[in-house]
Each structure stands twice: as structure tokens, then as C-alpha cells.
């Protein structure tokens, strides 16, 4: 076989190899393409089921919004009624141990080391905080006017010792006396439902005015400082909402230094007040 014939034969072999590779690639594509198309266009039955479920979900959401809108006058009436007279608020708290003891034992006492349980129990809230009366106390809402004005917040007073505080970031809180004579605070803002829900769920705003007011004013700085426990930033990116607490070591009227901003999971047990 001449040299020319050998070279021609080798070229034909290379072309055959290239042709075989093309056939193999074509076979792979024939297998892959239907799978890809199936992902892009699911089977008719699956698509219809998804569409039906989605439509049902949309109808339920629309029905909820319609019902909520039709009930808006009820919510408006409840809020105005609460502002007009805080006694209209029905108690939603559980009876404490003192109440249960009085109800079930008819004020019977047990002797402990020569003293009765009534002698050993803690003084009533009204005995500890006589100065918390809204109009007659040394520490009343007037004591915080400077802090409120400096923070850019707006205070609106109502009848029967209740008032509304709107922070500079538009979060709104209602202060009122509950049926036990203590101050209760409720976040009534609708600007950011996530923040409102977190504040209402993670805090028990109940007690005296001098400890509650600095806490509430501190909520205008939701994301401006790190967690006082783990020192990491309270990040709005991850929707980390702070849990504001008063420093347990503070025994005087708290200032901004006495307020702790903590991640919910970083609240030490000893700081819960």
C-alpha cells in the first residue's frame, strides 16, 4: 500500500470516529430534552391540581380580607372605648397565686415559723407604688415630657388616665390602667405588622410608669445598636427584632444606659422583669 493510500485511509478513520461521537451526542440529547421539557411544562394533571389549589388559597385570602374589612368598625370601636375608659378592657390575664389563695381558701392563713402567710406575703402593688397614680404622683407623664420631646415622639392624652405615645419611627403605643390598677402598654401600630407582632408577643408591658416609659422610648432605636448580651448587631436584614429589658441592677429612675436591647434568644433569665 502506497503512502498516499495509507494517509487517505487514516483520514477516513478519523472522520468515522467523529461521526460516531456525533451520533452518541445526538442520542444523549434525545434522552435529555424530554426530561428538560417535562420540568418546564409539567403534566397536565399536575398543572391543573396546582392551579386548583392556588385558586382555593387565593379565595380564602380574599375572603379573610373581606371579613377583616367588614369588621373594621368593631376594632375602631374597641380602641376608642379603651381610650375613653380603660375599665372597658376585660381582664385577659390568669389569676395570680394571691388571687387563687383568696378565692379558694377564703383568706385562711397558714402558720410558718410563727407568722401567718398573710404576714409573709409581698406587699400589694398599690403599697409598693403609691406614687404611680397618673395625676398625683411625683413620677407621672409630666416627668417624661423632656425625654418625649427630645426623641421626637408625640404624646396624646385621653380620658381616665390613658394616653397614646407615637414614636418618631411611627410605632404607636397605648398606655392605660388595667383592672388591677397597674399600667399596661399595647403596641397598636399598623405600620409594620411584623414589628408590632414581635413587640406584643415578646414583652409583658405591665408595671409602673417610670420603668415602662424608657423601654417604650427605646423602641425608636430598633436597629441602631448591638445586642447587649452577645454584642452582635441586631440585624434588620434577618428580621431580628430586639427584646427591650430594664437592667436588673437599676434601682433608680432608668436612663438610656439602664435599658438593654437583646436578641430574643439572648435574654438571660435573670434579666426578665
From Swiss-Prot:
What function does the entry list? Answer: Component of the Mediator complex, a coactivator involved in the regulated transcription of nearly all RNA polymerase II-dependent genes. Mediator functions as a bridge to convey information from gene-specific regulatory proteins to the basal RNA polymerase II transcription machinery. Mediator is recruited to promoters by direct interactions with regulatory proteins and serves as a scaffold for the assembly of a functional preinitiation complex with RNA polymerase II and the general transcription factors.
Its taxonomic placement starts with: Eukaryota, Fungi, Dikarya, Ascomycota, Taphrinomycotina
Family indicated by similarity: Belongs to the Mediator complex subunit 27 family.
Keyword annotations for this protein, in alphabetical order, are: Activator, Nucleus, Transcription, Transcription regulation
Q: Where in the cell is it found?
A: Nucleus
Main subcellular location of this protein, as a coarse class? nucleus
Annotated Gene Ontology cellular component terms: mediator complex; nucleus
Q: Which GO terms describe its biological process?
A: positive regulation of transcription initiation by RNA polymerase II
The GO terms this record gives for MF are:
transcription coactivator activity
Summarize the subunit comment: Component of the Mediator complex.
UniProt name for this protein: Mediator of RNA polymerase II transcription subunit 27
Q: Where is the signal peptide?
A: none
Amino acid at each position: 500500500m502506497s503512502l498516499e493510500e495509507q494517509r487517505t485511509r487514516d483520514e477516513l478513520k478519523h472522520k468515522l470516529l467523529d461521526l460516531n461521537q456525533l451520533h452518541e451526542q445526538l442520542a444523549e440529547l434525545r434522552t435529555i430534552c424530554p426530561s428538560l421539557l417535562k420540568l418546564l411544562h409539567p403534566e397536565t394533571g399536575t398543572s391543573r391540581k396546582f392551579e386548583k389549589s392556588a385558586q382555593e388559597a387565593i379565595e380564602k385570602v380574599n375572603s379573610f380580607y373581606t371579613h377583616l374589612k367588614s369588621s373594621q368598625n368593631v376594632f375602631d370601636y374597641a380602641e376608642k372605648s379603651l381610650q375613653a375608659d380603660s375599665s372597658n378592657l376585660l381582664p385577659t390575664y390568669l389569676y395570680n397565686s394571691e388571687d387563687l389563695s383568696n378565692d379558694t381558701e377564703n383568706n385562711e392563713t397558714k402558720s410558718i415559723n410563727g407568722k401567718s402567710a398573710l404576714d409573709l406575703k409581698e406587699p400589694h402593688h398599690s403599697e409598693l407604688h403609691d406614687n404611680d397614680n397618673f395625676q398625683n404622683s411625683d413620677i407621672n407623664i409630666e416627668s417624661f415630657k423632656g425625654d418625649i420631646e427630645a426623641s421626637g415622639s408625640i404624646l396624646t392624652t385621653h380620658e381616665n388616665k390613658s394616653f397614646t405615645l407615637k414614636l418618631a419611627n411611627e410605632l404607636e403605643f397605648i398606655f392605660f390602667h388595667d383592672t388591677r390598677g397597674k399600667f399596661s402598654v399595647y403596641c397598636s401600630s399598623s405600620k409594620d405588622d411584623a414589628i408590632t407582632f414581635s413587640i406584643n408577643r415578646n414583652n409583658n408591658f405591665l408595671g409602673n410608669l417610670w420603668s415602662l416609659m424608657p423601654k417604650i422610648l427605646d423602641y425608636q432605636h430598633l436597629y441602631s445598636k448591638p445586642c447587649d448580651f452577645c454584642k452582635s448587631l441586631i440585624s434588620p436584614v434577618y428580621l431580628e427584632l430586639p427584646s427591650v429589658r430594664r437592667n436588673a441592677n437599676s434601682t433608680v429612675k432608668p436612663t438610656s444606659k439602664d435599658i438593654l436591647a437583646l436578641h430574643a434568644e439572648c435574654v438571660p433569665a435573670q434579666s426578665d422583669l
